């Protein structure tokens, strides 16, 4: 019985050397060092930081942490940064590619939560949802909750799966899924989060959501989407659908 338990735990063991973490960053000198240190403490050594035209010391701090740094001369937006980072990670042929926000809102321990469905349950993509845990949901400001639900619905209407947190920055892709999605990716800005889900459905990829925790700070709350960004996402998704 003990031998069987040991064998099962070995089968479900995550080899973190086969995982690449992509961290898009724009003017993140305040948090990028801590974010990278925390990821490395959890055993994630293969990290790609995409400095999306920052005007501060984001690149210098990331380089000191010994990670791969790709730098855009001009700011291209979240979609542009993620596209560059995923393409870079694909060159190393990892089993799993993770996207992870630079602003400190994600727990590095939650990376395993999105990895497991892809590695062990036959899913092609997993999203860490801030909306599945009722306690976490209470911590999210009402405006963000309403905006998130609206964008979830829009993502579904535009041809994607209906998910609880379409705008989450914590995701896992299998190598094959990332290759399929990156070949069709058009978004340069925040609409990329919805486009990932739309393309997942287009390619018939199996997607799972898992609950994650979020670290809400004054700093992390100042980043990400707002009402104006939400309308921009809607407009760009409609344009992509038409053209």
From Swiss-Prot:
Give a Pfam family name. Answer: Glycos_transf_2
UniProt signal peptide = none
Q: Its Gene Ontology biological processes?
A: protein N-linked glycosylation
Q: Which InterPro entries match?
A: Glyco_trans_2-like, Nucleotide-diphossugar_trans
Q: Which CDD domains match?
A: DPM_DPG-synthase_like
Would you tell me the protein name for this molecule?
Uncharacterized protein MJ1222
Organism the protein comes from: Methanocaldococcus jannaschii (strain ATCC 43067 / DSM 2661 / JAL-1 / JCM 10045 / NBRC 100440)
């Amino acid at each position: 019985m003990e031998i069987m338990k040991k064998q099962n735990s070995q089968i479900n063991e995550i080899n973190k050397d086969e995982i690449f973490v992509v961290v898009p960053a724009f003017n993140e000198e305040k948090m990028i060092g801590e974010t990278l240190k925390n990821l490395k403490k959890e055993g994630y050594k293969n990290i790609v930081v995409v400095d999306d035209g920052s005007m501060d010391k984001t690149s210098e701090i990331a380089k000191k942490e010994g990670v791969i740094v790709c730098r855009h001369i001009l700011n291209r937006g979240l979609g542009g940064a993620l596209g560059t980072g995923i393409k870079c990670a694909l060159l190393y042929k990892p089993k799993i590619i993770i996207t992870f926000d630079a602003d400190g809102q994600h727990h590095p321990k939650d990376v395993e939560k999105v990895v497991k469905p892809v590695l062990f349950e036959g899913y092609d993509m997993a999203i860490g949802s801030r909306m599945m845990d009722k306690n976490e949901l209470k911590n999210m400001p009402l405006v963000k909750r309403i905006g998130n639900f609206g964008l979830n619905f829009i993502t579904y209407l535009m041809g994607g799966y209906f998910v609880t947190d379409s705008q989450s920055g914590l995701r896992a892709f299998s190598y094959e899924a990332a290759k399929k999605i990156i070949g069709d990716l058009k978004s340069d800005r925040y609409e990329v989060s919805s486009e990932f889900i739309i393309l997942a459905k287009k390619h018939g990829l199996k997607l799972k959501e898992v609950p994650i925790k979020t670290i809400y700070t004054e700093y992390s709350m100042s980043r990400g989407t707002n009402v104006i960004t939400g309308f921009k996402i809607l407009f760009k998704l409609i344009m992509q659908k038409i053209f």
